[in-house]
Amino acid sequence: LAPGSKTVALYLKEAGLDENTVVIYMGDNGFAWGEHGLIDKRQFYEESVRVPMLIRSPKLIKGGQVLEKMVQNVDVAPTILACAGLDKAPQMVGYSFLPLLQGKDIPWRDRIFYEYYWEHEFPQTPTMHGVRTDRYKYIRYHGVWDTNEFYDLQEDPYETRNLIAAPQH
């Protein structure tokens, strides 16, 4: 964790606030470090789209859990509001995942969507759109790369076998 995390944790404890405070520590994106021959965050591979997140809230959430549901960045603000006992604004498109963290079986999304638009500063990375379910991922490229991709994440979690040309898929 970042060096300031310990300072914040110590302050909350000394002030008697640590048991009634929600602390969220997260990145803004994943990052590829050579997987798929790439180094960056601008692809729809698992290394780039899986974002690390830790949440501590002793009064609301049991510690030590790993949430396997597909959560998106748009879900963070509604979750923070729910932790404070507030409803999300009607224009917010995300959902609170607090009930999931509390072990409740609630209806949840079965797919996520991804989009990245070509940037002048990163001309080697094409515009792409994708959809991911618990099992499958489809990536459609525009421009630079000429082959779309389709993966069975259950059989190939590291996305090494592109099934786009496989007739059974």
Describe the residue ranges of each PLM region.
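Secondary-structure boundary motif
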Residues: 14-17, 103, 165
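C-terminal cap/loop subdomain of S1 sulfatases and analogous C-terminal strand-loop tails that border
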Residues: 29-35, 74-77, 82-153
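Short, compositionally biased segments
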Residues: 1-11
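Long, internal low-complexity/basic segments
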Residues: 1, 81, 124, 155, ...
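A short beta-strand-to-alpha-helix junction
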Residues: 1, 17, 40-51, 61-78, ...
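Histidine-centered active-site microenvironments of extracellular/periplasmic hydrolases
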Residues: 9-65, 72, 93, 118-123, ...
